[in-house]
Curated annotation (Swiss-Prot):
Induction notes from the record: Induced by amino acid starvation and when translation is blocked. Induction is decreased in the absence of the Lon protease suggesting, by homology to other toxin-antitoxin systems, that Lon may degrade the HigA antitoxin. Transcription is negatively regulated by the cognate locus, probably by HigA. A member of the higB-higA operon.
Gene Ontology biological process terms, A to Z: negative regulation of translation; regulation of DNA-templated transcription; regulation of growth; regulation of mRNA stability
Any one GO MF annotation of this record: RNA binding
Class of this enzyme: hydrolase
Protein name: mRNA interferase toxin HigB
EC number assigned by the record: 3.1.-.-
Amino acid sequence: MHLITQKALKDAAEKYPQHKTELVALGNTIAKGYFKKPESLKAVFPSLDNFKYLDKHYVFNVGGNELRVVAMVFFESQKCYIREVMTHKEYDFFTAVHRTKGKK
């Protein structure tokens, strides 16, 4: 799968150095993998969840559930864009904002 950019992961690795290994591993695994559908990605990342308020957005738990990585995943074209890496508290706010906007 083509990882469009690793900027969000690199920035997060600097901001949360205690989780750098997990963030790098996430990026490498996505970039080296072929994931035909969400179930195949979930087989590798059991914590993967669909972000129900935005189409094609998925959430990875990283660092023992301390960080959330929100990514747009296009299975048909095998592309992944890491949108944001955030703490659990920031993710709760992100969810609340998008819940009020409705699904897009």
